Amino acid sequence: MFWNRLEVDLNTSIHTPELAMSSLPMLATLIVVASTAVAQTPVSSQPKPADTEVWKPVPAIVTPGRTNADPPSDAVVLFDGKNLDAWVSARDGSPAKWVVANGVFTVDKPSGDIRTKRSFTNYQLHVEWRVPENVTGSDQARGNSGVYLAWVNGDGYELQVLDSYNNTTYVNGQAASIYKQYPPLVNAMRKPGEWQTYDVVWTAPTFNANGSVATFAYVTAFHNGVLVQNNVALKGVTKDVGLPEYKPHGPAPILLQAHGDPSEPVSFRNIWLRELPPR
């Protein structure tokens, strides 16, 4: 607009001789001011690749296991095939009495559930389990156990263990379900006698000072390498009867269930986890 006006002024001066001489000082001043304004107008900065490059903190180096099932260098090994030193009775804290043989341990139903000595918050968990080939029973009374991802004062969040190979039951109680909350996305069960794997990412809930929920617990789980729980928000601790609900807690142990059904007991091996930072 400024230059258009200047052009008009110049044209007027040129075609009006009596104004030409008197307008020259003003025109010179306008040209100087316009040139200065153009020179001082900042050139818009262009984005550079370096603007979005993050260099620190540098991720820690972790040496992976020989296979995806083997513990990486930063893993906490909970069962290495030798003993149950990392576990105690959930009933009274005494040494775990489940049977260890040939690199495997098997549920001892009379002695009850076992839990880890240590407590954890957020983690990546690897568990291998097997329903015996000669398993009998049906529905929930067939190879039943459970991995409680956090166990607090008699309550916990259960990832179901069950023979779900040609065994009909309610879908939020089959293998790889978040028990009584979320059915698995698919049934990835191998037949009895074959080893199953669970790989789980557990994000613990957090609580406000008054005990209310600040953030929900979240679970992502793979059964035999197949995604079965996709970052689901848990509704609370597992309830066999009634609706799930939250109770405030901090770090908690992991529990393995000795289910009271009469079927042949489940076995476990190769259990490890990696502790994860807060979200």
Spans of model-derived segments:
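Bacterial N-terminal signal peptides that target proteins for export
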Residues: 12-28
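Short linear/disordered segments characteristic of secreted peptide precursors
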Residues: 8-9, 38
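Hydrophobic residues within membrane-embedded alpha helices
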Residues: 9, 19-22, 33, 43, ...
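Carbohydrate-interacting regions of secretory-pathway proteins
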Residues: 40-279
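Hydrophobic h-region of N-terminal signal peptides that target proteins for export
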Residues: 30-39
